[in-house]
Amino acid sequence: MEQVSAAKLAVLEDILESAIQEERKLVVIARFLPEIRAICRLSEKKGLRYSIITGAVKNRDEQVAQFQNDRDVPVFVGQIATAGLGITLTAASTMVFYSMDYSMSNYEQTKARIHRVGQRMPCTYIHLVAKGTVDVKVLRALRNKADLAKTLVDDYRSGLNPFAS
């Protein structure tokens, strides 16, 4: 039996219902395959068709095209390590991070899937983070990495070389 947070699924269900009522498409990103399977089951339970990209999916271009072009496919489910590069998901302007990994590169690249040329709506990012879980640590680590990167760039732009010995 795979363990997946029932609380997160309940929140995601509310987000899905809201998006569908407003006729908006939604991208849901997760790290682990059991979570992805649970998200797919939730979509099926709601009668929603979805596109999916994980490491095992071979027809990625078809999955993306289906999500981008088919009004009857309102949900895209992606694994953060494999759905974060080289695809355009501008049919949606909302992305839900069901779970994340510690890679700042994966995080930024994944966010950029909906925030690219062709996007006509403001982008919204929702992070499902439960107090007292590893999710808090991952989000904190990503924020610290972003702060460090900003500091290094700001120092470099102001004439300080953070890499000089």
Q: Can you annotate each of these PLM segments?
A:
Residues M1-F76, I80-I87, V153-S165:
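Conserved Helicase C-terminal RecA-like lobe
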Residues I39-R41, I87-A91, E108-Q109, L139-R140:
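Short amphipathic alpha-helical segments
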Residues T54-K58, S99-M104:
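Short, acidic/turn-prone active-site loops that include or flank metal/cofactor-
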Residues F76, M95-V96, I114:
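Short, well-ordered beta-strand core segments
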Residues I87-M100, C123-H127:
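A short beta-strand element within the Helicase C-terminal
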Residues Y102-S165:
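A conserved SF2-helicase RecA2
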